[in-house]
Amino acid sequence: MTDPAHLAANRANWDERADLHFADETGFYRIAELLAGANLLLPIERAELGDLGGLSVAHLQCHIGTDTLSLFRQGAAEVAGLDFSARAIAHARRLAGTTGLPARFVQGVVYDAPSLLGEARFDRVFTSWGTLVWMDDLPRWTRAVSALLKPGGRFHYVDCHPTAWMLAPDDHGNLALRYDYETPPESPIPVEVTANYNLSTRILENRQTFEWSHSLAAIVNALLAAGLVIEHLGEHEALQWAIGPRMTQDTDHLWRLPPDHVHVPLTLTIRARKPG
């Protein structure tokens, strides 16, 4: 059972971040491009998802909906987004109205997604970028994912690699081990958010969050225990945001380490299928 205090702190943080990200003063969220008709899904996501022509997609932890709406531009016929932040969902609905893209946005926690998103089941379930650190119960998470899928449907996971979650810059700006590979549900990592990954210098008022690290084995085994079949695992030396000062952003909007830095996986991708 999620500690209500942890959930409340995380929600307050993300409500505040949602307002900041929707304002998009730094351009990190590329809202102007979205409104101009762009597909904001990054190359890693596009390659993993493939053509979504005619398919229904549930996007979990959708935040302000920029990627959710981009799923239509990847070919999806029906899209539903879910996030626990009321402010994020309000902004997502506003973007849907402005773009004219008919996404359905629902507020709630991922564990309750099968009931919150209604009786219909989906061809695809998608989650990406900074999602799993907010989950304290992997089996409950994967059961929700499985319940959302139609028989034969697929789950697409794109997020920071478990190894990368362990890293932080040293005094020379190189990434070094700092955090545990895995944290128990009852002992999250308390994190005071003092820097915004969207490159804003604005100081948040609700800085305290609680996060969980999950090993690769724990993630994979939870998916298997939920009855899903792993079809593909991928590791990538690029990430949606910078986790160290020596990382630079390329024209594809992904951040990478310099050639002289030790090579480490930064993004993990998983494709899993529900039998049937």
Language model features by range: what are they?
Residues 1-31:
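N-terminal, positively charged/glycine-rich alpha-helical extensions of SAM-dependent methyltransferases
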Residues 154-197:
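Conserved class I S-adenosyl-L-methionine
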Residues 26-55:
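Conserved alpha-helix/loop element of class I SAM-dependent methyltransferases that forms part
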Residues 139-154:
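A short glycine-rich, Lys/Arg-flanked "PGG" loop and its adjoining helix->strand segment in the class I
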Residues 56-113:
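Class I SAM-dependent methyltransferase SAM/SAH-binding core
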Residues 209-233:
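Short alpha-helix
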Residues 123-139:
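A short SAM/SAH-binding and catalytic strip from SAM-dependent methyltransferases
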Residues 114-125:
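A short acidic, Gly/Pro-enriched loop at the edge of an enzyme's catalytic core
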